[in-house]
Each structure stands twice: as C-alpha cells, then as structure tokens.
Amino acid sequence: MLAYHGSQSLKNKLLTQIEIHRKADAIVAGTYGKLNGQWKGCAVGCSVRSLDIIDGKLGDCINNAWAENIHQRLSERMGIPLELARLEDTIFEGLPESGPKGKVRAHWPTQFAYAINPGADLTLVWPKFAVRMLKRCVGYAGSNERSVTAINGVIALFERRIAGGVVTLAEWQTARVYAAAAAHAAAHAAAAHAAAHAAAAYAAYAADAADAADAAARKHEFARMADDLLELLRESK
C-alpha cells in the first residue's frame, strides 16, 4: 500500500477540499458527520467526505451507514495503514480547540494530509511513533517498576517489528493486558493515557482525566504526539 496510491494529484485535491471545510468552520470534534444547515465533521469525517466530493459520490453522508468502517475506508482511499487513520482521529479529538496562536484542532486534518508524501510506504510509521511515545512514558513512570517493566516490554515488541521481525497476536495481547494495568498505576495521567493507547494498538483503551490539571496535561501530550507523527510522516518516502 502506497500513500495516495502514488498520486500527487489526489493529495492536492484532498488538501483543497479539507481547506474548504476548515475555512467554513466545518471541522469539529465529536462527530464523523452531521448536517444542521451546514455539514460538519471530525478529521476523519472531513477527509472521507472530501474524498467523496473528489469522486463525485456524496450521497447521504450523515447516516449511520456512512460512518461504518470509516477508518478502514480512509485507510484504503488514502493508501495509509489503518493504524494511522485511527491515530489521526485519536489525536484530533485530543488536541485543544485553540492555543496562543489561534485554532489548533481544526488545522490538524490539513497538517496530517500535507505531511504524507505520495508513494510513501508508511508501514513502519506507527511502530516508530509508538516507540517514541512509550519511551517518554518510561520517564514519566519514574520508580514505578511495574509500569517501567510493562512499557519496556511493549517497546521491545515494536522495535522487533521495526527491525523486520514477527510479533505474534498472543504477544500483543499479553503486552496489552500488562501495559493497561501499568498505565492505571502510572503517576502521570498524560503518560498513562499515552502508554495505554500505544500498548493497545490492537485493542480499545482510554484513560479518563481526573481533574482540570490532568486534562491540560493530556492536551499537551496530544500536541507532542501530533508533532511526532507529522515528523515521521514527512520522513517517510
């Protein structure tokens, strides 16, 4: 699978449509697509709707059927791994609405699409991203040996995959259980969320922020995640 199926034209058209949505304030969190006088949707919803517009296949983009398998459809149509389609969504929902320089979240779909080079093989972007995030989490975990051991175990699996080795489903499942448990015990809430998300690459897991300070820390962590992902995407040729 090659990004944009090797087509610079597809990338250009997608960026144009995403920017139309952004300038119309149509990129919002919490929904894949809704219509209340004007269509609005999240990063993934915006991207899929943009591709529908490009293909001339709008149809009914706000019903439940349209949202089914939306990450898989984005993966196939953009030529990117499914993990990255899900990660684009996760980061978008976690980013702050705005920052000192203006809006943050609404720019994310454009930044994500722009960072991807047509024809690039993005297979190893997710494992490399996960390793970066998890290594930060080791620092956050401090003296919590249970967390450090669990996180290092997941790092080892991802590094084996990056090196071309095979990681079995049983190994992923075991790592998921231990890392999720360790994440609950981690002292830093943002690290706990990041560790759980990376360890659960093949399962659903989310950690709730306990208070406003926790939520702010998580927003900061998601901003760092966004920067890491964009860097890895740009490096992939």
Locate each region found by the language model.
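Short, glycine-biased loop/turn motifs at secondary-structure junctions and
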Residues: M1-H184, H188, H193, H197, ...
